[in-house]
Amino acid sequence: MTYESKTGNVKRFVKALQQEFDVEAIEITDDTIINQEFIHITYTIGFGEVPERTLSFINKNKNKIRGVAVSGNKVWGDNYGLAGDKLSAKFHTPLLLKFELSGTKQDLQKIIQEVQLIDKHNTKLDQAQ
């Protein structure tokens, strides 16, 4: 997994994932290049916008992205987690989860289930080739 956090909500979510499920996660920088498939976790800014660093990172690594998850705040109404919808549409990758602020235990379970489904699907594809 890769992630970007601004206020700390995404970072707290990722840290909880690491503690609960021992997953590997990399906080992206402007220069991050990924050599393996990944799921990216980010946040929504402004009125449903994608953070610029996330957009640039995924553009550079778009052939390896397998899904996105996004933090948001429901007080934004229709703009809640909208960055996830935008990333999903732009890069033709599934939106795996929208979670509020730093998420819940149920959100942690949900993202792990989604990752397992992706891994299972990729294993079947590898075996078919």
From Swiss-Prot:
InterPro entries assigned to the protein according to its UniProt record, in alphabetical order: Flavoprotein-like_sf, RNR_Ib_NrdI_bac, RNR_NrdI
Protein name in UniProt: SPbeta prophage-derived protein NrdI
Family from the record: Belongs to the NrdI family.
GO molecular-function terms, A-Z: FMN binding
Pfam families registered for this protein in UniProt: Flavodoxin_NdrI
Function: Probably involved in ribonucleotide reductase function.
Native source species: Bacillus subtilis (strain 168)
GO biological process: protein modification process
Signal peptide (UniProt feature, chain positions): none
Source domain of life: Bacteria
Cross-referenced NCBIfam families: nrdI
